[in-house]
């Protein structure tokens, strides 16, 4: 369903007295479908944050019954200090839903499901794998920020008909050690067909962002994190039944581990609940 169809459907549906939630991506849509009462809430999924924002800007000009809420991934925008959101549009707590789940009380459940342990892991073992995964995804997030600041247009995503960015080019599959900034930079430059960018200039940008001492949860992007996890599962860290998981299967595991009770501890939930209470609309299960 394209954004014009969604906009017209919401604008013309005078019988709907509940809430419409517009999200980007299938994972976000499925998560909110699991948490909401379908009689009181309609979930609309669009492909990009730009489409969510465009829809919310258009709907803000239309008088209608019911209430519409947009939810977009932060995608490092608050850290970059850019973009004012339209009315009734909220950011995720961290850069996206996946990193919200990763930095929540759901992670121990995810770790026990995905990773191989000789015995039930204690808190220190859970924290160790959490820290390792965050550190490996962090360097990619840092390079994303440098790229945004410089305007190089590097590619980190998997496009149609395009091969994946190979994380094993800068992360050692055998022990998950980091091969260094040059390996990361070369992998992303090659993936982006931007070999002319100077590595020393990129490394200066990485040094600057690291001196700023941001929290990892401000920098790490869910797409990178789930790719790192999928790579980790392919060596001794993974269980036999999860060793062949790809990024999409890891994301499903994240969603299944994230309960409504855990979601209620998030700032996003508090923001949604506050807005809905103001309008006298209850929509969660």
Feature-to-residue mapping (PLM):
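Acidic, divalent-metal-binding catalytic cores of TOPRIM
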Residues: 1-285
